Amino acid sequence: MLDTKYLRNELEFTKERLAARGFALDIDHLKALEEKRKSLQVATEELQASRNAISKSIGQAKSRGEDVAPIMAQVGNLGTELEAKKIELAALLEEINAIAMSVPNLPDESVPVGKDESENVEIRRWGEPRSFDFAVKDHVDLGETLGGLDFKSAVKITGSRFIVMKGQIARMHRALAQFMLDLHTIEHGYTEAYVPLLVNTDSLLGTGQLPKFSEDLFNLKPATEEGQALSLIPTAEVPVTNLVRDTILDEADLPIKITAHTACFRSEAGSYGKDTRGLIRQHQFDKVEMVQIVKPENSMDALEQMVGHAENVLKKLGLPYRTVVLCTGDMGFGAAKTYDIEVWLPAQNTYREISSCSNVKDFQARRMQARYRSKEDNKPALVHTLNGSGLAVGRTLVAILENYQNADGTVTVPEALRPYMGGIEQLG
């Protein structure tokens, strides 16, 4: 959620920055609402002052033996009018807040301007894609040959875009998550968290999934015994970031760095016909998430650090990748700046996204009222939040199967994973 000063006092600047990401801000409507708000605010305050002043005169009139009935009637009328104005003002503020909740974050000035993913900017590559002297198989063929990817059973049990993993491939999937968690906690300084896979509406509002992305969620019915509606998490970013909702932290507590391995659930609304084969786009998938809570002046450095942490996973696994900075037109709703890391997939002969790391600045913190108390002035100020995939486990499995495949259909286990696989050097 943007600072309301941008929607009140800096409308032209805000409109220009949002236009760069393809969002049209109706500033005429906002100006009209703001004028109405000011008018109602003044009217409410004047009515309150008049009512208070006249109420005080009742006692004086009584002491003089005067009939106070007319004054009482006047106070009653003012009270009725005041209540009506308060209701009108509350409804207007709710309308303004709803608009504010639907406005995306302002892109950082360092973000390249562009209309869509074709204008994202590659900033570096690592590793050389392997040259094969045999026909390359995709992960679906490899997984089915190895007896480890069972799409038919998943369709029977649940439906499309789900998977049953078995044997060595299931073990590698588990090993990858453990490897990533160990790397982030031991080498990168994160604290591991185990979090709920179900979250309430306040949590989804806090991180920006609601109200805009309600169609992407799997919602549970009926509500809980507390009467709360719950949804399956689309990413661990939601429960982990909400750990600091409605909290005032000490400056000494920052930065907070948390990692969590969870299943994630997405309806993939709008993705009909995309990546229908294999593990690339599933309704349920595992991901190791990284979240940082930092002071505002440190958030851009923290973003670069987080990208490096995600890249380090791929380096240790020996998987070629490239890193791109997203242009204004391709960024997510809450992001001020985003880097995507794309891993090389030989069967597709291209790079595919395996991690997205974003600096959200104070966009989520304002929604969540996540603050810290500065040592300098002891006043609460909004933190900055960052999130990133470290990595998507299923897509990492896909990359290993395809990049480490052999001519006989076996798959070499990357050296970094072997301690997590009981020393196994090869699948198949």
Curated annotation (Swiss-Prot):
Binding, ATP: 266-268, 353-356
Subcellular compartments: Cytoplasm
A Pfam entry, by short name: Seryl_tRNA_N
Matching InterPro entries: aa-tRNA-synt_IIb, aa-tRNA-synth_II, aa-tRNA-synth_II/BPL/LPL, Ser-tRNA-ligase_type_1, Ser-tRNA-synth_1_N, SerRS_1_N_sf, SerRS_core, tRNA-bd_arm
UniProt EC number: 6.1.1.11
Family matches, as NCBIfam families: serS (TIGR00414)
Domain-level remarks: Consists of two distinct domains, a catalytic core and a N-terminal extension that is involved in tRNA binding.
The protein, known as: Serine--tRNA ligase
Gene field: serS
